Swiss-Prot record:
Broad class of enzyme this protein falls into: transferase
Protein name: Death-associated protein kinase 2
CC per GO annotation: autophagosome lumen; cytoplasm; cytoplasmic vesicle; Golgi apparatus; intracellular membrane-bounded organelle; nucleus
Keyword Nucleotide-binding: yes
Gene from which the chain derives: DAPK2
Species, as recorded: Homo sapiens
EC code: 2.7.11.1
Tissue expression: Expressed in neutrophils and eosinophils. Isoform 2 is expressed in embryonic stem cells (at protein level). Isoform 1 is ubiquitously expressed in all tissue types examined with high levels in heart, lung and skeletal muscle.
Effect of residue 367 to A: No effect on interaction with YWHAE
Domain comment (free text): The autoinhibitory domain sterically blocks the substrate peptide-binding site by making both hydrophobic and electrostatic contacts with the kinase core.
Record's compositionally biased regions (Basic residues): 358-370
SMART domains documented for this protein: S_TKc (SM00220)
Modified residues (Phosphothreonine): 369
């Protein structure tokens, strides 16, 4: 039996047994900077789960691994949540080098990969997926939990072999409980999806998730990314200037209702940005009359453009994400004088699958909308 590590007084201890004594560990599902996710089967029940092996930081001076505080924060949040659109935590084990989270197995793949394989998609169908995302975020926000890493890669399907698959929000490595009266600042997340207040190192709240939902919706309807530039400086400048538009090449078949939904999310001033409740009540999500409902049914997503632009976006992202993160980190270090070894966790969550391994084929052509 392994020695128990130092932990917060209120944190329920992690099991110190060998996870392999209780689970058969299978194939790798994904990997990140300091984490590997593998399929596993519980020996006592035969049920399948996902085992997330998080590499522990061994000392404050180390550049490798995740700090105890960050691991405990993720576990604490996962232990609080129970919602059909949010991944669930089954158990936690610990050994000398890793903390192992036994998570619900979400095996249907990414939502956007599923959409790219469809032959047609109306806005009505698209909003059924957005509504599930909003429902999951609404649950988190009622608990004052901000995800801070909402992006297509973290929106998964429980089972893709049904007409309207069940969405699961995953990866709570950057999630944070927002406390009233306590200022929270950080530079983290995936740059393409971060809100201006993150780039500018301003106080953060639940509003940052709403910005990310705006970016996700924009990409879902077009395949193009609203702020992704040819350089890291251009991307960050686009975000802080809220520089985007609805290029006719990508949005010729998009309804004004859908564009209005996006516009009201991609607002720089956090107080003027839609809240999760306001987003759920928006007529694109919840039509108030037959005319609005008909607009959603008759407006279609250009899936040919979506497939082409989404693949190009993924290719570009695989080459730009590291330099973007490094730029964000350097900016933060200048503002708050961080040690260089404190930056690694902040670029993105550690369960982010290695983007370079994905099947991206063509470079993306820069347009005025992205």
């Amino acid at each position: 039996m392994f020695q128990a590590s130092m932990r917060s007084p209120n944190m329920e201890p992690f099991k110190q047994q060998k996870v392999e004594d209780f689970y058969d560990i299978g194939e790798e599902l994904g990997s990140g900077q300091f984490a590997i996710v593998k399929k596993c089967r519980e020996k006592s029940t035969g049920l399948e789960y996902a085992a997330k092996f998080i590499k522990k930081r061994q000392s404050r001076a180390s550049r490798r691994g995740v700090s105890r505080e960050e691991i405990e924060r993720e576990v604490s949040i996962l232990r609080q949540v129970l919602h059909h659109n949010v991944i669930t935590l089954h158990d936690v084990y610990e050994n000398r080098t890793d903390v192992v989270l036994i998570l619900e197995l979400v095996s249907g793949g990414e939502l956007f990969d599923f959409l790219a394989q469809k032959e047609s998609l109306s806005e009505e169908e698209a909003t059924s997926f957005i509504k599930q995302i909003l429902d999951g975020v609404n649950y988190l926000h009622t608990k004052k939990i901000a995800h801070f890493d909402l992006k297509p890669e973290n929106i998964m399907l429980l089972d893709k072999n049904i007409p309207i698959p069940h969405i699961k929000l995953i990866d709570f490595g950057l999630a944070h409980e927002i406390e009233d009266g306590v200022e929270f600042k950080n530079i983290f997340g995936t740059p393409e999806f971060v809100a201006p207040e993150i780039v500018n190192y301003e106080p953060l709240g639940l509003e940052a998730d709403m910005w990310s939902i705006g970016v996700i919706t924009y990409i879902l309807l077009s395949g193009a990314s609203p702020f992704l530039g040819d350089t890291k400086q251009e991307t960050l400048a686009n975000i802080t200037a809220v520089s985007y538009d609805f290029d006719e090449e990508f949005f010729s078949q998009t309804s004004e209702l859908a564009k209005d939904f996006i516009r009201k999310l991609l607002v720089k001033e956090t107080r003027k940005r839609l809240t999760i409740q306001e987003a759920l009540r928006h007529p694109w999500i919840t039509p108030v009359d037959n005319q609005q409902a008909m607009v959603r049914r008759e407006s279609v997503v250009n899936l040919e453009n979506f497939r082409k632009q989404y693949v190009r976006r993924r290719w570009k992202l695989s080459f730009s994400i590291v330099s973007l993160c490094n730029h964000l980190t350097r900016s933060l270090m200048k503002k708050v004088h961080l040690r260089p070894d404190e930056d690694l966790r902040n670029c993105e969550s550690d369960t982010e699958e290695d983007i370079a391994r994905r099947k991206a084929l063509h470079p993306r052509r820069r347009s005025s909308t992205s």
